[in-house]
């Protein structure tokens, strides 16, 4: 594993013209989407390809954050573990960035580490969020590549997503933005996406792309009514396994975008 402070090694990697791909995922309110991005990472994983998933802050499975690696000038390999599902796992910050925001210098350091890490992988997925003070993305590299916004099926989510997209546009300019609607069928998700896309076009001049919808596998009990059992599953409840298929569909759409999105070779 390389030393991120080794300038010669970094230059060799840049000269190699890596086609590493970076996909960042952000929650509708500018916050992380931890469990959701894990499922997407598993769906994105392909044979003979290496994938790195970077969480926003330290998880139980990640003993060392990249923030700690940078602070202690430690070997970068200490900040990466092999996940049982087959991808590599790391994390950016030591603590939740909502309560412990990073300094600009540290953001720059972490951005450099992630950029160099990407040369060892085919795909890098970053769980990003908006700074609560500057309202910019955690890493500048996230604004140079694909950004996926996760929103649920609600009017509140549409408003929150609009505010998040507004901040991203104001701070970073033209960023390729895609949307996934969770807790919804494809048709339901498309309806909410169209409403969000319409207001973003009208007021921000931003056009979004719909990646798909992710239903939930949990059964939803019917309301208690006279003469009916409360645990009867409503007809529109999603069947188990549909969630996994929906993630695969989103991963497939992301894969189709590969040839039209920038990579580190041109960043």
Where on the chain are the PLM-derived regions?
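Short, high-confidence coil segments that cap the C-terminus of an alpha-helix
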Residues: 20, 49, 121-122, 174
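P-loop/Walker-type NTP enzyme "switch/lid" segment
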Residues: 24-29, 52-120, 225
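Conserved catalytic-core segment of NTP-binding enzymes
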Residues: 116-119, 126-213
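Extreme N-terminal, non-catalytic leader segments
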Residues: 1-31, 35, 42-49, 75
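Structural motif
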Residues: 25-31, 54-58, 92-95, 127-130, ...
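Phosphate/oxyanion-binding active-site loops and adjacent basic polyanion-contact surfaces
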Residues: 4, 33, 103, 156-160, ...
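Histidine-anchored nucleotide/phosphate-binding helix
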Residues: 35-45, 161-170
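C-terminal lobe/tail of nucleotide-utilizing enzymes
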Residues: 1-18, 174-267
């Amino acid at each position: 594993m390389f030393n991120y402070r080794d300038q010669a090694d970094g230059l060799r990697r840049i000269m190699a013209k890596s086609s590493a791909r970076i996909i960042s995922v952000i929650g509708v309110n500018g916050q992380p989407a931890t469990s959701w991005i894990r499922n997407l990472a598993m769906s994105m994983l392909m044979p003979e390809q290496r994938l790195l998933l970077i969480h926003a802050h330290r998880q139980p499975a990640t003993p060392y954050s990249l923030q700690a690696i940078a602070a202690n000038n430690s070997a970068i390999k200490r900040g990466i573990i092999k996940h049982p599902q087959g991808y590599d796992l790391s994390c950016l910050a030591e603590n939740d960035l909502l309560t412990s925001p990073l300094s600009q210098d540290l953001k720059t350091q972490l951005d450099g580490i992630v950029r160099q890490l990407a040369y060892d992988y085919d795909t890098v997925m970053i769980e990003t969020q908006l700074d609560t003070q500057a309202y910019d993305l955690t890493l500048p590299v996230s604004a140079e590549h694909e950004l996926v916004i996760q929103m649920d099926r609600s009017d509140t989510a549409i408003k929150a997503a609009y505010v998040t997209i507004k901040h991203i546009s104001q701070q970073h300019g033209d960023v390729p933005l895609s949307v996934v609607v969770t807790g919804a069928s494809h048709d339901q998700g498309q309806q909410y996406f169209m409403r969000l896309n319409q207001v973003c076009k009208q007021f921000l001049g931003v056009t979004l792309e719909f990646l798909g919808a992710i239903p939930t596998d949990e059964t939803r009990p019917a309301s208690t009514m006279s003469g009916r059992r409360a645990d009867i599953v409503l007809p529109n409840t999603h069947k188990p396994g549909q969630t996994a298929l929906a993630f695969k569909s989103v991963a497939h759409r992301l894969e189709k975008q590969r040839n039209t999105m920038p990579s580190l070779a041109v960043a």
